[in-house]
Regions:
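Flexible, solvent-exposed loop/hinge segments and secondary-structure transition points
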Residues: 2-139
Length: 139
């Protein structure tokens, strides 16, 4: 039986316990990554749809987004850009690029009463950053 009152036993015990907890945390973080990404995507879709509707049900949000929202990426002149997914663009990073390289997402909501254009907004507020989505009716 080892001497549990020795310094070497205490350090070895702490090292083994730290290693076990580190492996458990790494496994949990890796295992939960897909679930976290799904939650982030759902929150973004909910935010986009909240500009035009007031949906709270997860299944209804996913259904409406898939059926009624068209994603478009535009350049500074308003021309559609192919090969880039609007949902994956990070607006904060896009604003830091030069005008010629800047690509911006635009979401088109196809409602029964007509199209609505959903534009993401991002900027500086009084205390922190302000971000959200603004919906515009088709004129």
């Amino acid at each position: 039986m080892p001497n549990t009152n020795s310094n070497s036993y205490t350090f070895a015990y702490a090292a083994v316990l730290t290693l076990i907890v580190a492996v458990a945390l790494a496994a949990a973080a890796t295992g939960l990554k897909p679930i976290q990404q799904q939650a982030i995507d759902l929150d973004k879709k909910r935010s986009i749809l909240n500009a035009v509707t007031n949906l709270t049900d997860k299944q209804q949000i996913l259904k409406d987004y898939a059926e009624k929202v068209t994603e478009v990426v535009i350049d500074q002149q308003g021309n559609a850009v192919e090969g880039v997914k609007a949902f994956d663009l990070v607006l904060k990073k896009a604003y830091k690029k030069s005008d010629s390289e800047r690509r911006l997402p635009l979401y088109i909501y196809n409602a029964p009463e007509g199209k609505k254009y959903i534009v993401p907004m991002h900027g500086a507020g009084l205390w922190d950053e302000i971000w959200g989505y603004i919906a515009l009716d088709q004129d």
